[in-house]
């Protein structure tokens, strides 16, 4: 069984071990403007995404702006 994390409340296999790599799989470019990320309830500044390691059981929240009315 693959290790799991929670991403925006949904279980997901932990296929990569850095925050930046996971965000890339979600279409978030490194250092993307307007994107907020919290890992286990703590905001992670974009400059720390490459060095932030993910572990089984982590809870990740990704907030992105969207257009609409």
Spans of features found by a protein language model:
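Ubiquitin-like/PB1-type beta-grasp interaction modules and other compact soluble beta-rich domains
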Residues: 1-68
């Amino acid at each position: 069984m693959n290790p799991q994390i929670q991403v925006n409340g949904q279980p997901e296999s932990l296929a990569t071990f850095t925050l930046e790599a996971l965000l890339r799989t979600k279409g978030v470019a490194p250092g993307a403007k307007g994107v907020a990320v919290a890992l286990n309830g703590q905001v992670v500044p974009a400059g720390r995404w490459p060095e932030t390691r993910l572990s089984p059981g982590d809870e990740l929240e990704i907030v992105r702006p969207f257009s609409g009315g």
